[in-house]
Regions:
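Conserved catalytic palm subdomain of right-hand nucleotidyl-transferase polymerases, strongest
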Residues: 1-36
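Short, conserved non-catalytic motifs in the polymerase core
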Residues: 12-16, 59-85, 112-118, 169-170, ...
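Short, conserved catalytic/metal-binding micro-motifs enriched in Asp/Glu and His
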Residues: 16-18, 35, 48, 78, ...
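Basic, alpha-helical interaction scaffolds
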Residues: 98, 168-235
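Short linear motifs embedded in intrinsically disordered, charge-biased segments
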Residues: 242-392
């Protein structure tokens, strides 16, 4: 998708599907049949059948109770086995959608398409949505068509697609697995919401900072403030310069409250706290992902993003990653497929690259402060030239 949006001037679109009471509509007989088709023996099937059957529920309103009703479908939520059975039930959906770009996490199903022609993208999404709806209906599940969402990237037009019987208009941003995905794919919308949330926490710390000992203030910093930026950093790290500046400002404000120090420069506060900026932490995370790719510890979709250099000059074969040809800043330079090889090839200490285990690697870069970062956030402004690289 990034390649299509970067150099080829293509388009991308996605339909975010919403299932009505997904966990509560699982057909028990069909689930048992699917488990049998996957090779579960009779004893295992009997255990699962016993686990699901003879469940009853009733409703309490104030002091009144309804009559008991038997649960004839659905898997128990809040259990370890419930989500596993749900995933098994949904597993064969991908056989029906074998020629479709689909991502699924529990009951969140997203169809996506990319092409040089906008109409091709829209047509694929509509056709694939129909295929998905047919599978849901055949498996006793119901798609809440009115609550589906549609996103595009690469066009300024306000578009719509038909999902079943519903006409779904394009959204500017939608939440997917905790991330607010926007039309421009820069995640500024997500970070604005996140920064507002973290600012409220910092303000709460400011009100009680003077009555708390240092250790308590630092615990609040680590657990309630800094942790907010630890979710999906590889997704939002390619944000705008202004947004990165805002994140640093929040971090600095929090550190000053913890240390009750309002004069020391931000860089020195970081040293005192033995911590890094969030941008540098994100670079650490990129380095960890590249190590995992190199040592075959990553899932297939991550390994497909990168490729090793063949017999690179001056290095041992396979020690460096090939950089892709990119054409734009927004969709090319600001991407993991471009930045990952840069971090591994040019920024990471050679000693760290020689580590043999992931734990050893994490330990070796714990105190590493990334220097000469080539990303847009770390360039210097030159009058008349704009932002330029400090090095090749």
């Amino acid at each position: 998708m990034e390649k299509c949006l970067d150099g080829e001037g293509g388009y991308a679109g996605a339909v975010l599907m919403d299932l009505s009471k997904a966990f509560d509509t699982i057909n028990h007989e069909l689930l048992i049949a699917k488990l049998g088709a996957y090779g579960f023996d009779e004893a295992a099937l009997e255990i699962v059948h016993s686990y699901l059957s003879d469940r009853w529920q009733r409703i309490k309103v104030n002091t009144s109770f309804s009559t008991w009703s038997e649960l004839l479908c659905g898997v128990p939520q809040g259990s370890v086995l419930g989500p596993l059975l749900f995933n098994i039930y949904l597993n064969d959906m991908f056989l029906q959608l074998a020629d479709t770009n689909v991502c699924n996490f529990a009951d969140d199903t997203t169809l996506y398409a990319c092409d040089l022609e906008l109409q091709t993208v829209l047509r694929e999404l509509e056709d694939n949505s129909l295929t998905a709806i047919m599978w849901f209906e055949n498996n006793y599940m119901k798609l809440n068509q009115s609550k589906c969402h549609f996103l595009t990237s690469g066009t300024l037009e306000h578009l719509w697609v038909r999902v079943g019987d519903e006409m779904i208009w394009e959204s500017q941003a939608e939440k997917l697995l905790g991330m607010l995905v926007d039309k421009d794919l820069n995640f500024n919308s997500h970070l604005k919401v996140l920064c507002k949330k973290v600012n409220q926490k910092v303000s709460a710390l400011a009100r009680i900072a003077r009555i708390l000992p240092f250790q308590k203030r630092r615990i609040i910093l680590k657990t309630f403030i800094e942790s907010q930026f630890s979710y999906c950093p590889l997704v939002w790290m390619f944000c705008s310069r202004s947004m990165n500046k805002k994140i640093n400002h929040i971090h600095e404000r929090a550190l000053r409250l913890v240390y009750q120090d309002y004069t020391t420069p931000f860089e020195d506060l970081l040293k005192k706290d033995e911590s890094l900026t969030f941008h540098h932490r994100n670079i650490h995370q990129v380095a960890i992902e590249m190590f995992k790719v190199k040592h075959d510890l990553s899932p297939p979709f991550m390994k497909e993003i990168f490729s090793h250099n063949e017999n690179p000059k001056g290095t041992r074969s396979g020690d460096t990653f090939a950089r892709p040809n990119v054409d734009t800043v927004k969709k090319g330079e600001r991407s993991l497929r471009n930045f990952g090889p840069l971090v591994w090839n040019t920024m990471l200490p050679e000693k760290a690259k020689q580590c043999s285990s992931l734990e050893e690697f994490k330990s070796s870069i714990k105190s590493w402060i990334p220097e000469n970062c080539p990303c847009e956030l770390c360039r210097t402004y030159v009058q008349g030239l704009g932002y330029v690289d400090l090095f090749d």
